[in-house]
């Protein structure tokens, strides 16, 4: 079977086409602003403007027509309301016009599910992006969130720090490069609260220290990464210990960071378990993960009528009964 998936929870519009074992196309376009941040109305306008050309590009890349597609999947949430509505409307229109079944997909679950295309079975997932930071795993037929940020996502924290020190957006790659030149660890707040995390304190203190002019920016970048990533690894390891699972998967835009990968690799090697990171174009927000998860849901017997395709801005992973795994 062939599935087409549309992703549009935030500032990236993605369209993916997959089979059960292969990505046939995975194209996207991201709205970028000079200072970073996302205005929901602008993101929605971006998605509406680019949907048709991106759909054509995906179909051309896959070498198929829309009639060859067996089902349509779309990101139902969580995310920005205006962006989600553009994507849902487009998915409904395609499904109705071409008489295809439609499936609404939880964006966070899709980030973990795409790893299963590569042989991952039942992992603890660390999902780290601009707006989301979660440790989740399948337990009792639902994806349970074992730990998450209580304030801002790790990606937003890094981007905000980068903006405050004047190196622009996106900040992730620039902070990572600066951190490689760090020589001294500077103490910053380490905020793990039970199984949850907080990044506002480390961000505020790192910016405060920078403004004093007494610290090298390279050392601050290094210390920011070491402190924040150690907290992420700690909560992930706790989830592994609690669930007894023997796989960890790293997903989301921040999965591109090599230091975070290294720290997780060390932890998993120490525990004698597997560690996997999907190709980066499948880690970031993308349509292929939506298509793949929607296809797995459909093959597992999940059915949607049009009334069930309303968007869910606060869509929790544990709202979804996982009958397809």
Curated annotation (Swiss-Prot):
Required co-factor?
A: Fe(2+)
Q: Which InterPro entries match?
A: ATPase_NBD, Gcp-like_dom, KAE1/TsaD, Kae1_archaea_euk, Peptidase_M22_CS
Its EC number is 2.3.1.234
Compartments reported by the entry: Cytoplasm
How and how many cofactors are bound, per the record note?
Answer: Binds 1 Fe(2+) ion per subunit.
Q: Which Pfam families match?
A: TsaD
What's a BP term from Gene Ontology annotated to this protein? tRNA threonylcarbamoyladenosine modification
Q: What is its main location?
A: cytoplasm
Keyword Protease among record annotations = no
UniProt keywords, alphabetically: Acyltransferase, Cytoplasm, Iron, Metal-binding, Transferase, tRNA processing
Q: Which GO terms describe its molecular function?
A: iron ion binding; N(6)-L-threonylcarbamoyladenine synthase activity
- Annotated Fe cation binding lies at 107, 111, 127, 285
Q: Which residues bind substrate?
A: 127-131, 159, 172, 176, 257
Query: What does the UniProt record say this protein does?
Result: Required for the formation of a threonylcarbamoyl group on adenosine at position 37 (t(6)A37) in tRNAs that read codons beginning with adenine. Is a component of the KEOPS complex that is probably involved in the transfer of the threonylcarbamoyl moiety of threonylcarbamoyl-AMP (TC-AMP) to the N6 group of A37. Kae1 likely plays a direct catalytic role in this reaction, but requires other protein(s) of the complex to fulfill this activity.
Concerning its family, UniProt says: Belongs to the KAE1 / TsaD family.
Record's protein name: tRNA N6-adenosine threonylcarbamoyltransferase
In the UniProt record, the gene name given for this protein reads kae1
